[in-house]
């Protein structure tokens, strides 16, 4: 499990987004993390401590004078036992306290007394988020090395729409997992391709394949978690874009080729795992091809460019990774592919 053995202290502050923290605890525990929950008094008005105790399997702390903690030093014990402190949701009030070193409840005291990294997922009304005072606090926190996860833009509980809502639990978990990954690719730029291509026969038909893009998107996520700046050029797929990744949507092999060529300069790594069609119709019909009795239409096909093998710009990169699918003679095709690419250097 991706978070096996990791110890996370989760701070929950007051706000309607506190209900999302329950799902966050469930997902973190499912990935193997040990989660201890600390709540402000305001947070308990939205979700009860019993909910978090049931989901985490550990007592929940709301009072810095909790007698269950030796010497009444919960802010020390809970921070020293954690690999990270995660505050989600992080209210405007909490961000202000943290930026100015205030500590008047268990969550803010815990954050001030920590000797481990702190991640916070802001959640507030869009006007509160855009307020100059909040933005000054955000700038201070970022300069202090605190990782802010979000916020997102969308519908808010107050009925307004805009930036300020807490990102979803799944997105926070992605960021937490990424935080713990070794940053072997920090400072590197990675360009990737994924998914199928669609080669039009006419306005409604085309040649494609069964690629889902899952492998390419998983590799893109792993590269981002390793610290890389990732650009993903992908064919028509339904995969959600991993956080922090620049996604370029294309349809045909020619479009994918053009996008790769446009962005290849300055890249350190190219990973080509798209299922690019080998051939395309030479002259796609401008109109839908109608049935003509029993006569089947004939298609003239031309070869598509192979991004991995015919571009010196790509072959000159520090690292090139490509993939292909074969149904027989796997070793032979692998050796042949390597020989072809080596001969182009």
Model feature map: region roles:
Residues 328:
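A metal-dependent hydrolase metal-coordination microenvironment
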């Amino acid at each position: 499990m991706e978070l096996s053995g990791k110890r996370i202290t989760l701070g929950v502050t007051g706000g309607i987004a506190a209900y999302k923290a329950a799902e966050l605890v469930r997902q973190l525990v499912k990935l193997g993390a040990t989660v201890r929950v600390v709540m402000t008094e305001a947070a308990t008005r939205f979700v009860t401590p019993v909910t978090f105790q049931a989901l985490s399997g550990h007592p929940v702390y709301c009072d810095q004078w909790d007698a269950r903690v030796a010497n009444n030093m919960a802010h020390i014990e809970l921070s020293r036992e954690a690999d990270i402190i995660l505050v989600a949701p992080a209210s405007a009030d909490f961000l202000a306290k943290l930026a100015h070193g205030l500590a008047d409840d268990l969550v803010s005291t815990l954050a001030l007394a920590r000797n481990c990294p702190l991640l916070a997922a802001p959640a507030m009304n869009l006007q509160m988020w855009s307020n100059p005072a909040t933005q000054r606090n955000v700038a201070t926190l970022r300069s202090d090395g605190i990782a802010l996860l979000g916020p997102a833009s969308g519908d808010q509980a107050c009925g307004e729409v805009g930036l300020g809502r807490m990102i979803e639990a799944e997105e926070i978990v992605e960021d937490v997992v990424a935080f713990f990954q070794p940053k072997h690719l920090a400072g590197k730029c990675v360009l990737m391709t994924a998914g199928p291509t669609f080669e039009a026969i006419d306005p409604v038909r085309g040649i494609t394949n069964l690629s889902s893009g899952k492998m390419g998107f998983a590799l893109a996520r792993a590269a981002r978690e390793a610290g890389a700046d990732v650009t993903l050029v992908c064919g028509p797929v339904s995969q959600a874009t991993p956080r922090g990744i620049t996604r370029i949507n294309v349809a045909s092999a020619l479009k994918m080729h053009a996008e790769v060529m446009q962005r290849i300069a300055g890249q350190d790594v190219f990973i080509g795992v798209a299922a690019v069609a080998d051939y395309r119709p030479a002259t796609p019909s401008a109109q839908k091809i109608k049935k003509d009795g029993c006569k089947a239409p004939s298609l003239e096909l031309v070869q598509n460019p192979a991004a991995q093998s015919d571009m010196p710009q790509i072959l000159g990169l520090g690292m090139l990774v490509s993939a292909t699918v074969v149904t027989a003679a796997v070793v032979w095709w692998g050796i042949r592919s390597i020989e072809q690419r080596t001969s182009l250097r």
